[in-house]
Amino acid sequence: MTRTVTIVNTADIELVESKGSREGRAAGKAFPLDTGIPGVILEFSWRFYDKGYGTPRHRHIFDQYRYNLTGRRMIKDGFLEAGEVGFYPEGVYYGPQLQEEPCTGLGLQFQGLSGIPYITHAQLREARKALIAEGGAFKDGIYTKIEPDGHKVNVDSHFACTQYMSGRKLSFPQGRFEKPIVMRPQGHPWIRDRKLEGVEHKRLGQFGGSGIRFTRLQPGARIPAQRFEDAEIRYLVEGSIEYGGKTWQA
């Protein structure tokens, strides 16, 4: 598969209200993302969470990065101030979350090291409809169903949908960290790139097969065209760049 660069303006993407199983209002802008790498599925989005949005304490069967842009992301064990980054690995509990103020940020989700296939939000919505049709119910982030024998099922809503789409019984992978990792970029110095003049980096962390960094370019600095073996996402948070003969503003 030929790998091409996809570049978009956040302002041009439709804001879609979330109609999932969590409490409170949330909305997002999903960026078009095709890695060009077979089997590598990522979901990257701009997110808004309103006052009153909440989730119970839970864990994922995928890895997730969050970069908080404005406000405070009010999550126990993963609290993010504006400008901070969090890594929420598969199998690691965190939360609950209850927003006492609105916040915005970026979210990136992808398959973790366990190899459990990543289920997209479109697939999750499909699963939710199917599970409701089968007699289940979603409330406060929990999926509940009464089995024919009278047994009551209570599981995390996301896990229930993922298991449904997988078509098999799943178990959470063992967490490789005690809790989510919060990265504070203000405590990281800018390090000059060894090869590129006017380019600096803050390498915040490397976690298994993924990593995250900030890059800063001085006026006139250039990053030459190159081909990567792995998928890479860049989001402009300040200033402007030129790419493909067009100027892009943050």
Task: Show the residue positions of the predicted features.
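Jelly-roll (double-stranded beta-helix
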Residues: 1-67, 72-250
